[in-house]
């Protein structure tokens, strides 16, 4: 089959732009988008297997590629007018193949793979709208941005003969983002009037591999035991950590004594280990070499979850859950060192009729964090900070 869809969006949106005298200002910017989405697919369904081949093409066009505004706080040094680029035209294509096949009653295999490409080559704006810097030479006419993506997700499920009512799922997933955007030096002009030193663009890319094994055992009709192991390896470019390995061990107990009552207890332990931390710097603003970004720092996480589902009557469902997460960044000297989060959730849905459902929920989160910082380049004055956040929804 084949589908075509066009999305038109017009009007105004909030836009934040910097001006000379203050850090920024909000004002309405024009909005006029058009997205053309074309999808075609071939499907096969057999007694033992299914397959689907799909192609997607998306074209995004913006009739307003820039916005210009007057500076109400002009100082008379060429900052009377400012300009900024808006969302650029771009094109996305993706080809995917998904399928599943049942070899025997004990073994089933499924998988999905896709390759994609994103391209953006809208001409650059000048560094500044000011006549003094408007002709400052750019390294090239456009970004010539090219991004290639690929993903392979393979999984198989089969029953082991090691014990009765025991089954296992093994899965592997590879996800890659290959950024082919050229790297060049740029000489930006800050706030239209301040020429800055050279800086290069950073075409970020990553390569993620994930594999996992899950076991499920049902010793009785009302009881189920589950557990598993997962390893994820993430490789990055132009970032402080080039490689991260995270191992996850988990176990879960499920008890369903009645059809209207179901409870689950789950425990997870995650251990993230990184390669050598290499400070990238922020051009003319150096970073503390002891500082660690929390998403790239070594971390040990313990997480526990309790969840209960109740169905006292046919048209009423109640879910109550509680989880606690304890994070320890024991290798971080500057940055986030500890974090603890707890959450209580209540979800209720009531079906008035086949066409009407009433739904409500309540969530209370508590987050406690410990951070360390430094007030001197030599790190002789290290301070500690503590934060507490409460969020109710």
Positions of PLM-derived features:
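Gram-negative and organellar
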Residues: 1-393
């Amino acid at each position: 089959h084949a589908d075509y869809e066009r999305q038109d969006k017009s009007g105004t949106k909030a836009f934040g732009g910097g001006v000379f005298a203050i850090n920024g200002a909000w004002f309405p910017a024009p909005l006029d988008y058009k997205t053309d989405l074309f999808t075609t697919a071939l499907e096969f369904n057999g007694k033992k297997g299914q397959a689907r081949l799909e192609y997607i093409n998306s074209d995004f066009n913006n009739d307003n590629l820039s916005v210009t505004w007057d500076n109400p706080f002009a100082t008379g040094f060429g900052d009377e007018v400012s300009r900024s680029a808006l969302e650029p035209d771009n094109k996305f294509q993706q080809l995917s193949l998904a399928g599943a096949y049942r070899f025997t009653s004990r073994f089933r295999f499924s998988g999905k793979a896709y390759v994609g490409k994103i391209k953006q080559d809208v001409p650059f704006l000048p560094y500044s709208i000011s006549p003094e810097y408007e002709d400052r030479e750019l390294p090239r006419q456009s970004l010539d941005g090219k991004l290639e993506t690929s993903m392979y997700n393979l999984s198989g499920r089969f029953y082991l003969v090691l014990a009765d009512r025991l089954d296992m799922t093994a899965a592997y997933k590879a996800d890659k983002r290959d950024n082919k955007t050229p790297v060049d030096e740029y000489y930006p002009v800050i706030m239209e009037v301040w020429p800055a030193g050279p800086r290069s663009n950073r075409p970020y890319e990553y390569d993620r591999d994930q594999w996992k094994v899950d076991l499920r055992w049902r010793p009785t009709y009302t009881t189920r035991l589950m557990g598993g192991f997962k390893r994820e390896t993430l490789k990055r470019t132009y970032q402080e950590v080039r490689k991260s390995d995270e191992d996850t061990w988990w176990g879960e107990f499920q008890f369903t004594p009645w059809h209207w009552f179901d409870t689950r207890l789950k425990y997870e332990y995650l251990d993230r280990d990184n390669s050598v931390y290499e400070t990238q710097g922020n051009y003319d603003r150096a970073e503390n070499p002891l500082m660690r970004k929390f998403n790239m720092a070594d971390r040990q996480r313990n997480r526990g979850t309790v969840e209960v589902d109740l169905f006292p009557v046919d048209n009423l469902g109640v879910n109550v859950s509680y989880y606690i997460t304890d994070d320890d960044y024991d290798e971080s000297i500057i940055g986030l060192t500890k974090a603890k989060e707890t959450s209580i959730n209540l979800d209720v849905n009531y079906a008035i009729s086949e066409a009407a459902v009433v739904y409500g929920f309540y969530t209370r989160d508590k987050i406690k964090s410990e951070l360390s910082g430094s007030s001197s380049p030599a790190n002789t004055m290290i301070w500690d900070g503590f934060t507490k956040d409460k969020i109710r929804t």
